[in-house]
Structures are given as C-alpha cells and as structure tokens.
Amino acid sequence: DKCNKLVPLFYKTCPAGKNLCYKMFMVSDLTVPVKRGCIDVCPKNSALVKYVCCNTDRCN
C-alpha cells in the first residue's frame, strides 16, 4: 500500500501491517491536514484532533 505524505506530491510505501492511510486535522481547522501517512489502526478522534482513515492507495 502507498499513502501520501503531508505534501501530496510525495508518498511512501507503507511497512507491513500499516495498511491504512490517514489524515490528521486539528479540530480548530478541518480544512488543512497537519499530518498524513501510514497507520495500523485508525486512532480515535479527540477534543483536539480528528483522524480520517481509508484503505486504498494514496487515498489520503
């Protein structure tokens, strides 16, 4: 699987077991992701951050 890095022009091949792509947003600004990458399980959202996860190549 491949996931975008923070700058979507670049991407990385995910290590084994980390086959979800994610975008992390600050709840205060849901328009600009602050982090992107590969992850094994989608984290829970909190009061400060929101995660958006997906499972196809470069879907983040």
Curated annotation (Swiss-Prot):
Gene Ontology terms describing biological process: killing of cells of another organism
* Listed Gene3D superfamilies: CD59 (2.10.60.10)
**One Pfam entry name:** Toxin_cobra-type
Quaternary state and interactors: Monomer in solution; Homodimer and oligomer in the presence of negatively charged lipids forming a pore with a size ranging between 20 and 30 Angstroms.
For this protein, the record's InterPro entries field holds: Cytotoxin_Cobra (IPR003572), Snake_3FTx (IPR003571), Snake_toxin-like_sf (IPR045860), Snake_toxin_con_site (IPR018354), Toxin_cobra-type (IPR054131)
Q: Give the organism, scientific name.
A: Naja sputatrix (Malayan spitting cobra)
Q: In which tissues is it expressed?
A: Expressed by the venom gland.
Query: Is Calcium there in the keyword field?
Result: no
Q: Which GO terms describe its molecular function?
A: toxin activity
| Native organism taxonomy | Eukaryota, Metazoa, Chordata, Craniata, Vertebrata
Q: What is the recorded name of this protein?
A: Cytotoxin KJC3
The family annotation for this protein states: Belongs to the three-finger toxin family. Short-chain subfamily. Type IA cytotoxin sub-subfamily.
GO cellular component terms given for this protein: extracellular region; membrane; other organism cell membrane
Query: Keywords assigned by UniProt?
Result: Cardiotoxin, Cytolysis, Disulfide bond, Membrane, Secreted, Target cell membrane, Target membrane, Toxin
Q: What is its main location?
A: secreted
